């Protein structure tokens, strides 16, 4: 147990039939994604942290302060948290501004009033302040709900699938606001999701739940490239890398960005990019093919010298997952077992990873 971080050692249910059993410490910085399939215990864990659900037994400490143990249970309103639910849960009789002012009163913090203008600008709420919730779209409601949670001046922000009730267009509208929130505020965020594209775009760290237990926890890419983790199975298997913009090819609308010791050609994004800017890129394992030699007569632009780390079984019995080292970075390739057999893949083998598609996610 450490004095810093969110320490969780809790269980719900009985010893014979546990619903949730967690023993870990979550870093109180950046965004930690709590990821897993439906029914894995994500929302239950978040509600325990918030005090909305009382764990059957165990301890919850936040930076050394006891929120729950054998003798005490801190009520939700006494925990320094903000909570954003799947549904915005705005007060229907108050305007957007009224909802924000309610949060400021609850905060009882002089800095909350000073924070109002910054939060309104950051989340693009200027034109919405005089509207009532029934006059707002789903995405607009969630932006107001996020602002309301921030104006409580929380030490920890909990977000329970805040985009789950939105259609794809609304999700794409709100994601840049969440990225801006991450950049502008130091408040640590626990972000519950079962959508890998959201996690890849937002998270610094990742905690994976399955059947009520923690099966992986750590830095985002460490978890994504752990071939024993559920995240490294199936069609969404991916890695997330930082790439530095080196040059632009305006003729072909491409940018060249560097990962550790290799270059990636990437379709230029709609927004402007600068030389030396760091981009977050996502590479799906299914978009990586392997070759024993470098092919120049191919439509694939990205051919990276790589070394095989391991070959693992996939949940699909016809597929295999190959873990690769590209300099100090790690890639995953999802190929057929027949292809792995044909190439006689072995650990430490040198080969070429051909990356069909690279997506900029941040």
Swiss-Prot record:
One Pfam family it belongs to: TOBE
Keyword Cell membrane part of the UniProt annotation: yes
Membrane topology label: Peripheral membrane protein
UniProt-recorded name of the protein: Molybdenum import ATP-binding protein ModC
Binding site for ATP: 36-43
Record note on quaternary structure: The complex is composed of two ATP-binding proteins (ModC), two transmembrane proteins (ModB) and a solute-binding protein (ModA).
Organism listed in the record: Saccharophagus degradans (strain 2-40 / ATCC 43961 / DSM 17024)
EC number from the UniProt entry: 7.3.2.5
Cellular location(s): Cell inner membrane
Domain ABC transporter stretches: 1-236
Similarity-based family: Belongs to the ABC transporter superfamily. Molybdate importer (TC 3.A.1.8) family.
Function description: Part of the ABC transporter complex ModABC involved in molybdenum import. Responsible for energy coupling to the transport system.
């Amino acid at each position: 147990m450490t004095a810093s971080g969110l320490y969780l050692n809790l269980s719900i249910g009985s010893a014979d039939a546990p619903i949730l059993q967690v023993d870990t410490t979550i870093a109180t910085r950046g965004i930690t994604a709590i990821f897993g399939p439906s029914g894995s215990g994500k929302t239950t864990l978040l509600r325990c942290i918030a005090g909305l659900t009382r764990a059957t037994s165990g301890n919850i400490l936040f930076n050394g302060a006891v929120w729950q143990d054998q003798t005490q249970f801190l009520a939700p309103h006494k925990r320094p948290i903000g909570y954003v639910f799947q549904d915005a849960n705005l007060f229907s009789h108050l305007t957007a501004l009224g909802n924000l002012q309610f949060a400021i009163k609850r905060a009882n913090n002089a800095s909350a009033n000073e924070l109002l203008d910054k939060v309104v600008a950051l989340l693009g709420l200027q034109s919405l302040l005089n509207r009532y919730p029934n006059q707002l779209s789903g995405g607009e409601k969630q932006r107001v709900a996020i602002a309301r949670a921030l104006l409580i001046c929380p030490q920890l922000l909990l977000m329970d699938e805040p985009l789950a009730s939105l259609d794809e267009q609304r999700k794409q509208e709100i994601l840049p606001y969440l990225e801006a929130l991450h950049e502008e505020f130091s408040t640590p965020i626990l972000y519950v999701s079962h959508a890998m594209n959201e996690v890849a775009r937002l998270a610094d760290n990742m905690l994976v739940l399955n059947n009520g237990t923690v099966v992986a926890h750590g830095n985002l890419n460490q978890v994504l490239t752990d071939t024993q983790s559920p995240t490294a199975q199936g069609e969404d298997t991916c890695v997330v890398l930082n790439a530095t913009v080196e040059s632009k090819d305006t003729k072909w609308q491409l940018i060249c960005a560097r990962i550790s010791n290799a270059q990636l050609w990437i379709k230029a994004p709609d927004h402007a990019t600068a030389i030396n800017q760091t981009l977050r890129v996502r590479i799906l394992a299914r978009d990586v093919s392997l070759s024993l030699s470098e092919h120049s007569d191919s439509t694939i632009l990205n051919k990276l010298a790589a070394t095989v780390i391991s070959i693992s079984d996939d949940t699909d019995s016809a597929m295999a997952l190959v873990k690769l080292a590209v300099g100090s970075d790690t890639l995953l390739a999802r190929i057929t077992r027949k292809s792995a057999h044909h190439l006689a893949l072995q650990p430490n083998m040198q080969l070429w990873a051909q990356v069909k598609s690279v997506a900029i996610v941040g």
